[in-house]
């Protein structure tokens, strides 16, 4: 059975544009809004209050593209897009989207690099993407220089974005690198570039972003998201939400890195429909609460751990005037229904909505509507999205309450992975539908509409604050410690982070034998912290065993470890 969006969801009323870049689509959508809907600044800095009008944003994109064309020797209609890849390794800035769209103006591809990424991850992504140009911010200059040295990228191919001065603490000197503002000032004096010459259908094959994702196979990959994929998803989300929004514009706050698919998606949507997106460099609870009061924020785009923190610490809700908030939208991880219910009790006027999707689906596939909230579900399908639930025997689920692996069909689904033919073969089924690796089931809401519930992931991946963490990455580090002879890692529930990694270890009887288990656990925890970033840390979640439960073939029985927990 093929599941589609409920009858109440408006259909996309026109053909999805396939001959323009996604930035041009978003900006043209904004400038064509009726006067009562337009005029709002698309982006506002949460710290300084600085903003640009849509007209100024359009100019900044154009000026920046001219300057980059001169700096890099690129022309809009010459050369291959794969040879024009620009990495963006930065905390959120006001010019993030101007930079992305300037690269697209030159027929290039953006490589968003998560600011939490450690140097080896940055190097791996840039190498796979054949990226030779990078923009960074002051607090990440040291990491960027280390990555550039390893990749033999010269200093004149490193540029900087601007973080608010009030936000910076002991910033690295960056005078030797040209900034976005300098490039824009130079570009204003240069001749206008020739327009992009895209034939019909070009946006379907032209990659806009190489987005990093852990993927369903358990290894980190770069997903090729086309301009058409993003345009389609913007239209899908906007049509789904139009049922409840009634053309009303909103001021929204995003607590997500713009380099994440979720953040990228929201930014394009905000501009297209004339909303205002208040941006902070990185999430800070106090800053978010102050920002809500200062800018009268109506909608919060967050990840579940943020709502969990608010539900667990109700006093936070009374520190500032949050009366403007009407809705929250969570994504990137599942929101536990108990947390939603608790927050709903604390703030009954807030509509707590959830979105579900993958980087590979162009981000959003299902979304809760304010008129049909059902805590624990992932909401209803967007228009032009189809899902099949494939059972272990390969047949499709034939109705409600019958689980199976979620397979997607949508104009927003990605092209494939960069340089990974094996994963590409395994990612699509025999019908060409995208396999999610998630087990889901459709159930009928109290209002009578089909909602998708995600039951579990097929693989052993752990989701920490929306980030997918691979147990084997932690296991590999543990096994490199001299006092560890065997190790296995599972995910365990965590109220604030969704999940956290927990390690079961068999210790050596001859190395560090003078340490008791508590001291050795502390030593191993510090060892892991020195090798991996925060989402992989173990803290007190280390248990010592005499031996790990294993099958006859030697495979660790993680289900037994989960039963112990």
Curated annotation (Swiss-Prot):
One annotated GO biological process: emericellamide biosynthetic process
Region (SBD1): 284-354
Its EC number(s): 6.2.1.-
Keywords associated with the record: ATP-binding, Ligase, Nucleotide-binding
Pathway membership, UniProt: Antibiotic biosynthesis
Chain positions recorded as ATP binding sites: 213-221, 354-359, 438, 457, 555
Entry keyword Nucleotide-binding: yes
Disruption phenotype: Impairs the production of emerecellamide A, C, D, E and F.
Region (SBD2): 355-417
GO molecular function, one term: ATP binding
Function: Acyl-CoA ligase; part of the gene cluster that mediates the biosynthesis of emericellamides, secondary metabolites acting as antibiotics. The biosynthesis of emericellamides initiates from the highly reducing polyketide synthase easB which catalyzes the formation of the linear polyketide chain. EasB produces several polyketides that can be further processed by the downstream enzymes. The polyketides are released from easB as linear polyketide carboxylic acids, which are converted to CoA thioesters by the acyl-CoA ligase easD.
Domain comment (free text): Both substrate-binding domains (SBD1 and SBD2) are involved in the substrate recognition, and are sufficient to confer the substrate specificity.
Family per record: Belongs to the ATP-dependent AMP-binding enzyme family.
Name of the protein this chain belongs to: Acyl-CoA ligase easD
Organism field: Emericella nidulans (strain FGSC A4 / ATCC 38163 / CBS 112.46 / NRRL 194 / M139) (Aspergillus nidulans)
